[in-house]
Structures are given as C-alpha cells and as structure tokens.
From Swiss-Prot:
Domain BPTI/Kunitz inhibitor: 21-71, 89-139
Keyword Ligase carried by entry: no
InterPro entries, A to Z: Kunitz_BPTI, Kunitz_BPTI_sf, Prtase_inh_Kunz-CS, TFPI/VKTCI-like
Summary of the function given for this chain in its UniProt record: Anticoagulant protein that may inhibit thrombin by binding to its exosite I. The recombinant protein delays plasma clotting time and inhibits both thrombin-induced fibrinogen clotting and thrombin-induced platelet aggregation in a dose-dependent manner. May be an anticoagulant for the common pathway of blood coagulation.
GO cellular component entries: extracellular space
Protein name (Swiss-Prot/TrEMBL): Thrombin inhibitor hemalin
Lineage top rank: taxon: Eukaryota
Length: 141
C-alpha cells in the first residue's frame, strides 16, 4: 500500500512538474526585453525567446540549463551538424539587423577558438551558434 501511494504521488508530481513544458512561449504583457528559454514541444528542445518581464507562464527559464533540467535533455554532439567552413566558420560575426541581445557563439578562424558575441535576433550569417559545443562541433573538429 505504501508503495502504491508513493508511486501515485511520484507520478502526479512528475506529470505536474513537466506539464508546463507543453505550454507555448508566452512573452507576457510588459515591454521589457529579457532573453529567456522555453521548451518547444514540436522541436523537442529548449529555444530562446524574448520575455516582456511580467505575466507569461511557467515555461520560462533564465538559462538554457534550467530549461533542459526541467523539460528535456541537453543536445548531444550527434545532434549538431558540420558547417560549411567558408560560410559557417570563416565569416566574421554579424549582430544582424534586429535589436535583441542574445548571447551566441562564433568561430574565430584567426584564433581557432569559439568565442561569444551578441546577436540581435535576425539576419547575420551562418557563423552563429547557440552554444560553444555546437560551434566547436561545427568548426573545430
């Protein structure tokens, strides 16, 4: 009986904990400009969005790791793609035309290392990676 109660409570807590991961990204009604992460059910991974600072829903995380810990596994190297070296690794980083402030990674061909830069959210070029691991997989190895 105790095992049944434990399993029932554990199952309910697990379902409740992950239920919010199915909610869509909700920027809220305010006009702040806060890069956040949400779990995209269709893509099966955490994605970045802009949060306005109030309202919204529980599918809203300050870091990629928080989102992955709550809703899904981190990406594996096998999920990444190799880049065309000329367009995806040699190009200088481009902020793009929009005014967002996303932390991204680019491959610095001169140093042979992946480095952070600020991406505006649209435009830019292919030398633009969501994390260091993706950049290194695409350009370094």
């Amino acid at each position: 009986m105790k095992l049944f109660v434990f399993l029932a409570l554990f199952g309910a807590a697990f379902a409740q904990r992950n239920g919010f991961c199915r909610l869509p990204a909700e920027p809220g009604i305010c006009r702040a400009f806060m890069p956040r992460y949400y779990f995209d059910v269709e893509k099966g991974q955490c994605e970045q969005f802009i949060y306005g600072g109030c309202k919204g829903n529980e599918n809203n995380f300050e870091t990629l790791k928080e989102c992955q810990d709550a809703c899904g596994e981190p990406e594996r190297a096998s999920d990444f793609e190799k880049a065309d070296f000329e367009t995806g690794c040699k190009a200088a980083p481009e902020t793009g035309l929009c005014k967002a402030s996303f932390e991204r990674w680019f491959f610095n061909a001169a140093s042979g290392e992946c480095e952070e830069f600020i991406y505006g959210g649209c435009g830019g070029n292919d030398n633009n990676y969501e994390n260091k691991e993706e950049c290194e997989f695409a350009c370094k190895y």
